UniProtKB/Swiss-Prot annotation:
GO cellular-component term (any): cytoplasm
Highest taxon above the source species: Bacteria
SUPFAM superfamilies membership: Mss4-like
NCBIfam families noted in UniProt: peptide-methionine (R)-S-oxide reductase MsrB
Protein name, UniProt field: Peptide methionine sulfoxide reductase MsrB
Signal peptide span: none
Keyword hit for Nuclease: no
Family recorded in the similarity comment: Belongs to the MsrB Met sulfoxide reductase family.
Keyword Metal-binding in annotation: yes
HAMAP family: MsrB
GO biological process: protein repair; response to oxidative stress
Gene Ontology terms for molecular function: peptide-methionine (R)-S-oxide reductase activity; zinc ion binding
Matching InterPro entries: Met_Sox_Rdtase_MsrB, Met_Sox_Rdtase_MsrB_dom, Mss4-like_sf
Amino acid sequence: MSTDEPKTDAQWRAELSPEQYRILREQGTERAFTGEYWDHHANGEYRCAACGAPLFSSSAKFDSGTGWPSFYEALNAQAVRERTDTTHGMVRTEALCSRCNSHLGHVFPDGPPPTGLRYCINSASLSFHPKD
C-alpha cells in the first residue's frame, strides 16, 4: 500500500492503541491532566501518533492551565488542517493532521502572542521526538 492510499478502519485499529483509536479516529478527547504530554517540557518535535507527520515544535508549547498540551502555532501552515466541529451542542474549530486526517484536538482564539491561538491537543494524538 502506498502512503497516499487511505488506511482502512481495520488497519487503523491494528496500528493504534484503543485510546489512540478512540481519539484519533473517533474524535474522542482524553481527560484533562491525564495525558503523557500535558506537563512535558523537553525540546523537540511533536508528531502525529497515527502517521508520524511533524505537527508542532516544543518552542510553541505553553502552559494553558487546561490539562492538555497547548501550542500557539503549528509547525508550518500545512501541518494542521482545521474544520468546523458542531458536536456536543457547540461550534468549535477542530484540528486534524493534514496528512492522515486524524483528530488532534481543537483550536481556540484565546492563546498567547504572537498568534492569539491555542491548539488544545490530546496527548494520545502525539508522539514526541527529542531534538538531537
